[in-house]
Amino acid sequence: KDKVEGTDVMSFKFSKQNDQLENKITLLDYTAGQFAFFDIGEVYNDPKGPLRHFTISSSPTENFIMFSTRIRDSPYKKRLSILEKGAKVKVRGPEGEFVLHQDYSKPAVFLSGGIGVTPFRSMIKYATDMQLPVKIIMFDSNRNRNNILFKKIQVKI
């Protein structure tokens, strides 16, 4: 659990590598915009169990894996919100084809609302870090200014 984004959204960061292994292998190779399944272990009174999918909001250029979610009153989200630093989480994936296009002569136009901005955070951070020659145009709708997520990333484009 890293920080609160907006009003009811939390971002969770996890180590990208298993430092206990001799080769320090990367545990998840993904493309900006993809999602993965996160298993947080025992969740009581939740018929859906301990596995949920989340868009990876971090960029592959960052040294951590991050996902962001609205914290609601479900058993899963309650358990997620009290995870201790260093907690083990199983990850399966990545999956999905909602990624930045490769034709940089055409602008990338993003439309998002609220928590739907998460794949764009990943793509914008990646494009910025890699200095890709792509023009990014973003339209992001929120209830008010306090609910804008990832303000620093959005200001850069």
Model segments located where?
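Ferredoxin-reductase
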Residues: 1-87, 142-144
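FNR/FR-type flavoprotein reductase catalytic core
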Residues: 72-157
